[in-house]
A protein has these predicted regions:
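C-terminal structural segments of small proteins and small subunits
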Residues: 60-77
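N-terminal first-folded block
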Residues: 1-35, 39, 76
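Residue-level signature of transmembrane alpha-helix interfaces in integral membrane proteins
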Residues: 25, 53-55, 71
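Short, charge-patterned binding micro-sites
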Residues: 3, 41-62
Length: 77
């Protein structure tokens, strides 16, 4: 079993409050989870309104497939 992780540090320019940031992050996480069948969550900077840290994890039998899936997530975000 191969487990791959991806850590994204995102700057959100159009966010002007924590509520707006959380709405944007919720949309991103939902689309990433549904499109790529990975686990994703906001893992850092929860109190900053223009910055977010997202963690993504994928599991598979083949390293190339896991790496490719995480590369697609990175390009998508």
């Amino acid at each position: 079993m191969i487990v791959g992780i991806l850590q994204l540090d995102i700057i959100i320019h159009d966010s002007n409050s924590l509520k707006a940031k959380r709405g944007n992050i919720r949309k991103i996480l939902s689309r990433v989870k549904n499109t790529f069948e990975v686990a994703a969550a906001e893992v850092g900077y929860q109190d900053l309104w223009q910055r977010a840290e997202i963690g993504v994890a994928a599991v598979g039998n083949d390293r190339a497939v896991v790496n490719q899936r995480l590369d697609h997530v990175l390009n998508f975000v």
